[in-house]
Design a protein with these regions (language model features):
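The feature captures the beta-strand-to-loop junction immediately N-terminal to the Walker
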Residues: 33-35
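Conserved ABC transporter NBD signature motif
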Residues: 56-64, 73
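Conserved ABC ATPase signature
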Residues: 108, 133-137
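Catalytic Walker B motif of ABC-type/P-loop ATPase nucleotide-binding domains
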Residues: 158-162
Length: 247
């Protein structure tokens, strides 16, 4: 379990997160939704240490992750940003980068590292492209390769920033089913979602973020009943989690 308590973070003098508290449980997929500029991406960056936190704590086991180095934190948390580079390397080479937090410099991969990387590629369905250039993959398969990189870190928790962006609906659904499967295997998954209906259909819990604060947290059914979607987004959701389209 990952407990985030009263986390305050931002950029220089500009505060973006104002005392965020959230619990991420193993075996659950938690989605963060909210308007643009509400602090969704900043929340993930603050958890992994890319954005500095001015106060609060992030507890895993008996340790406050804020006291750990970025590398030590990467042994516990995998992070996939929304904007990703396209390195000039094979899928296998990129996925092996997920082992970096676990190996010393100069980096030499062990048989165990290669085994873990292969298992990650197999789980995400990209092992048949292992020696292909990453740039040769379709958008959906490329995203699966990036997720394999995260899995190769061998962490309990995955933090994903809008992982379905730029994917067509078929690949969006395929990716969300894979995330559900990973959660059911015991991983805790925290994902920023732009698509409210995907969040409602695939999440165990949803945190609604607005103005740097969590204004509602609960199951998809609780979110739907609360009316918070109408309040925050000015849209209405049907009982089947589809959007009500105004004509």
């Amino acid at each position: 379990m990952l407990e985030i308590n009263n986390l305050v973070a931002g950029y220089g003098e500009r505060r973006v997160l104002s005392g965020i508290s959230l619990t991420l449980k193993n075996g659950e997929l938690t989605s963060v939704i909210g308007p643009n500029g509400s602090g969704k991406s900043t929340l993930l960056k603050a958890i992994i240490g890319v954005v500095q936190s001015s106060s609060g704590e992030i507890i895993s086991g008996d340790r406050n992750l804020l006291s750990l180095s970025y590398r030590e934190r990467a042994k516990k948390l995998s992070y996939l940003p929304q904007g990703k580079p396209l390195p000039d390397m094979s899928v296998r080479q990129m996925v092996l980068h997920g082992r970096f937090p676990h190996i010393e410099y100069p980096r030499k991969y062990t048989a165990r590292d290669r085994e873990i990387a292969l298992g990650a590629m197999q789980k995400m369905g990209v092992d048949s492209f292992a020696d292909s250039p990453l740039s040769s993959l379709s958008g959906g398969m490329r995203q699966n390769a990036y997720l394999a990189l995260c899995l190769a870190q061998d962490t309990e928790f995955l933090l994903l920033d809008e992982p379905t962006t730029y994917l067509d609906i078929k690949n969006q659904l395929s990716l969300m089913r894979r995330l559900r499967s990973l959660a059911e295997e015991g991983r805790g998954i925290l994902t920023v979602m732009h698509d409210i209906t995907l969040a409602l259909n695939f999440s165990d819990k949803i945190a609604v973020l607005s103005g740097g604060n969590i204004v509602f947290y609960g199951t998809p059914q609780e979110v739907l009943k609360s009316g918070i979607i109408k309040t925050v987004f000015d849209v209405e959701i049907n009982n089947d989690y589809s959007l009500k389209i105004k004509k």
